[in-house]
Amino acid sequence: MPGDMGPPKQGGTRYGSISSPPSPGPQQAPPGGTYLSEKIPIPDTESGAFSLRKLWAFTGPGFLMSIAFLDPGNIESDLQAGAVAGFKLLWVLLWATVLGLLCQRLAARLGVVTGKDLGEVCHLYYPKVPRILLWLTIELAIVGSDMQEVIGTAIAFSLLSAGRIPLWGGVLITIVDTFFFLFLDNYGLRKLEAFFGFLITIMALTFGYEYVVARPAQGALLQGLFLPSCAGCGQPELLQAVGIVGAIIMPHNIYLHSSLVKSREVDRSRRADIREANMYFLIEATIALSVSFLINLFVMAVFGQAFYKQTNQAAFNICANSSLHDYATIFPRNNLTVAVDIYQGGVILGCLFGPAALYIWAVGLLAAGQSSTMTGTYAGQFVMEGFLKLRWSRFARVLLTRSCAILPTVLVAVFRDLRDLSGLNDLLNVLQSLLLPFAVLPILTFTSMPAVMQEFANGLVSKVISSSIMVLVCAVNLYFVISYVPSLPHPDYFSLVALLAAAYLGLTTYLVWTCLITQGATLLAHSSHQRFLYGLPEEDQENGRTSG
C-alpha cells in the first residue's frame, strides 16, 4: 500500500503503514504454514461486474468461520434458551448473528487490506505485557471452545451407541478424530473446505428435520424473532441471553477469519482488487452466517416448542409411554421445570417423535463437534504465530489444545454426572462472552486506523455501530458478573474473583484507551502510543515488532 501516513518528523521518529509490500501474482505462504500453504487464484473477469466464478473462488473462509457459530456450545445455548424462554430470545439470536457478521466483516477487511492477521497486528502495536495477556485470554477462549467440542462429541457417541460408549470413552475418542482431520488437511485446501461444507449440510438437514417434525407455532416464532422483548424474564433468561452472545460471537473466530482470507490471491497493489475482495468476502460471510442462523433457529424453535415450561414429571411420562421408555429415568419425578441439556434434548425428541429423531439429533451433534475441531486448531496456530512469532507443527499445536481441553473434561465425565458436564458447557458459553472484548476492541482499534487500513479505515457510521456493539457487550457482561457474584458458594471465592476481575478490568481499560485514540481522542496518545494515531515507527517496521 503506497504512502506514508505519518506526520512530519517528530523527535526523529517517522510513522507509517504496517502493510507488507504488495506484489502482484501468486503469494507464497511462509514455510511451516498450514491452511495458508496453498493459495487459491482468483479468475480474471470484467472489471466492476459481479461474477459467480469469482464468488466461488472467494468461497471458503466464510464457511469455515461460520462453523464457530454452529459448535456444540451453540447447540447447547440454543436448546437451553428455547427451554427456558420459549421463543422470547429469538430476537437475541438474530441480532447476535448480525453483530457477529459486522465483527467478521472487520476481521476480513483487516486481513485483505494489510496482508496480516489480527494476531500479527497486535504483535506489532501492543507493548509486551498487554500483548502476552491478550494472547493468554484468546488461548483460554480456544481451549474453552475445544472443551465444548469434546463434550458435544462425547454426548453424540453416547446417544448413537445407546449408552454403550460411556462419556469418558467418548471424550477419549475425540483424540483420534482430531488426528484424522490433520490427515485430511494434506489433501488440499479446497477439498478440506468442501468437507466442512458437507458437515454444515449434515447439520442443516438433521436439525431441519427436527424442526419439521416438531412443527413450532409459526406466529409465536415470528413474534419472538422480530419483536425485541422478554416479558416476565429474570436472571435465568439473562444468563441465556449472555450465553447466546458468547456462543455466537466467539473471540478466537475474529482472529481466525482475519487469517483465513489470506488464502486467496489478492493483488494488494491494486485498490480495485482490494475493494472487490472485500465485497466478495462480505457476500460469502453473509451467506454462510445466514445458513448458520437458520440452523440455530431450528434448534431454538424446536426446544421452545417441545420443552418450554415442561416439567420433569411430564417429560418422564412422555418417555415412559414411548418406545424409548428405558430413558425415562433420566428425568426426576417431580413438578420442577425440566433443566434440559444436549443429552436430554436428544432423548426427549426421540420420546416425542420416535427413535429416528434421537439418532438424527445425535448425528447433527456429532457433525457440530467434528466440524469445529479443525477450525479450533487453525485458530490456535494462527494466534500463536501472530502474537508470539512461534511456529509449531499442526500435530504439536492440536496436541497441546486438545490435551488442555480433555483433562478437565474427562475428570468431570468420570467423577461427576452428565448434568455437571452440560453445566460446564453453559459456563463455557458465558466465558466466551466475557472474553469477547479482547477480540472486538483490537479489531475495532486497528480497522479504525488510517495508518493501517489507508482509505479502507472505518468511517463514522461503522465506528458508531462497532463502538455500540462493544458498549453493549461490556454492559451485559458487567451486569452478569454483578448478578453472579452474590451466588458464589463460599466467601473464599470472592478474593479469587476480585483478583481475576482486577486483571480483567485492567486489560480491558488499556484496550479501551488505545481504541479511543484511534476514534479521535488524540489527547490520550502519549509517547510510544502515538503509533495508534500515525502508524508504526519505521524502525519498528524494520524489526517487525514493537519495543517493550
From Swiss-Prot:
GO molecular function term, any single one: metal cation:proton antiporter activity
Cellular component, GO, one term: plasma membrane
GO biological process, one term: iron ion transport
Residues annotated as glycosylated: N321, N335
UniProt keyword list: Endosome, Glycoprotein, Ion transport, Iron, Iron transport, Lysosome, Membrane, Transmembrane, Transmembrane helix, Transport
Signal peptide stretch: none
Extracellular side: 74-82, 161-164, 215-237, 305-346, 416-426, 486-493
Domain of life, source organism: Eukaryota
Location of the region described as Disordered in the Swiss-Prot/TrEMBL record: 1-38
One Pfam entry name: Nramp
Subcellular location: Late endosome membrane; Lysosome membrane
InterPro entries attached to this UniProt entry: NRAMP_fam
Transmembrane segments: 56-73, 83-102, 140-160, 165-184, 194-214, 238-256, 285-304, 347-366, 398-415, 427-447, 464-485, 494-513
Homology family: Belongs to the NRAMP family.
Classification via NCBIfam families: nramp, Nramp_1
Summary of the function given for this chain in its UniProt record: Macrophage-specific antiporter that fluxes metal ions in either direction against a proton gradient. Localized to late endosomal lysosomal membranes, delivers bivalent cations from the cytosol into these acidic compartments where they may directly affect antimicrobial activity. Involved in iron metabolism and host natural resistance to infection with intracellular parasites.
Record's protein name: Natural resistance-associated macrophage protein 1
Species, as recorded: Cervus elaphus (Red deer)
